[in-house]
Amino acid sequence: MRHSIEMEKLTLGVCYYPEHWDRALWKDDLQRMKQYGIEVIRLAEFSWALMEPEEGKYDFSFWDEFLALAAEENMKVVFCTPTATPPAWLSEKYPETLNADGDGNLMYHGMRCQHNLTSPKYLEFCEKITRRMAEHFNKYDCIIGWQLDNEVNCETNEYYSKSDHEAFRAFLKERFGTLDNLNEKMGTIFWSQTYTDWDQIHLARRSTVGTGIANPHMQLEQVRFISHSAVHYLALQASIVRETAGDRFITTNGIFGNLDYQKLMESGVDFIMYDSYPNFAYAMDRPDGGEGDLKDRNSSFNLARTRAISPLFGIMEQQAGPGGWNFRIHQASPKPGQLRLWTMQSVAHGADFVSFFRWRTCSFGTEIYWHGLNDYSNRPNRRLEELSLVKADFEAIKDIAGHPYEAAVGILCDYDNEWDGQKDVWHGPLRNFSTDGWFRSLQKKHIPFDFVDFREETNLKDLEKYELLVYPHAAILTKERVEILTQYVANGGKLVMGCRTGYKDIYGRCPMQPMPGEAAELCGVTVEDFTFLAPGEPMEYVNWNKKRIP
């Protein structure tokens, strides 16, 4: 398996939905795409009802017709499994496939992603449609790769259906073996939370303080379980597609919360595709940080995070116009030159393939305001003119494909601390504050850096490529990670550790030792006392090189 995309040259693509348009438009669309340098189209990620209109009755004639035309026009295709949008008949007949909120209320048909990831019945239907598609469409040479599902964990990354509670118990049984071990690791003696039967265990439900708030150690295990479920869900599809895929790649698009993408890469997915919408930084109800808040660099942060998963990756959805659903999100239109800027920003961070969303703005449905390269009128516009410039750019620098991004600075990150910080009001804000602080400093000084996923599998060679490593938030820190960091420093590497280092163990419990815990010898210090500033207290500063640093 690759873990990096393999393109012979920089390549342009676009997301296309022939099912939304009259057949009379298809050929002209494909020919115009080629005029603008587009060589690859993504298809079918939302077309389950078209391919299985009734249970067990498969009809691939629509896609046979279109793929024949795509092959005739020498257009390459990334074909998708449509499991993000189960058809109405499935959701209605099999309510056990539906997701639920923390209070047990089901999420019904009418939008997308109303399903859960653990229902045996839903996994059965996913397996069937994936297998039928893989076997049927294998004959089309124009298909160069497969996208599994679409944006897993996007609409929601929490699951509370009956099958999720059952699968959570099975996950904990596999992880801890016995109730005695689970009770000890989860500290359930506190507040008389001790479990005496596996059936007493549930995902975090409504409690005296709200929905989704429970034992903090169990909450951390819950997120690990959600990631485990998502990886298993996609791995099932990957294994089926792999049987007939040949040398076609298998990917999925992201990146979203509560999902360990490194484990996903080990489960049968070749590399990750990122969905890049730079104006999300201004449109998702985020507070204004004032002048210099670097919202324009938000995509740089996410692209670097993607590169930690796949050193060379692709963009499956690059923002092409203003965007938003009819009930949320207000993304402004790209300014003149900005579409080109965003495209080159993706390339500069390691993308060898950039696919725009979408070819033409849809004239119906929830995304009528999510504009593509073409407007509703299908007439030439400034975005298409700018695409011509991007085509020329790609031709001029096409040979940089395959060349990895080079950085001497690495920011260590890990899913344990990310997930632990999500509901920890003491440590969560510090994680974002410290990581963002390093990101801002490196960006302002134009210093290339990588995010480095620190995992059990990380070895010394992975770290020694960096002259400087920063671990801004290592609240959860294991002895094994300290040992490899100690080797890195002993071999001449420079390491900066953030505040609250070593505060917790792998289960989120606080060891009976002074901070920084296992890293005390490595850091050469112990922390005797610490505090937050009380409300109204002035900010503390240190003077360094004639500067006041908060």
Where on the chain are the PLM-derived regions?
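Carbohydrate-binding surfaces of carbohydrate-active enzymes
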Residues: 201, 247, 277-280, 286-550
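The substrate-binding groove and active-site-proximal loops of carbohydrate-active enzymes
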Residues: 11-23, 44-62, 108-127, 152-157, ...
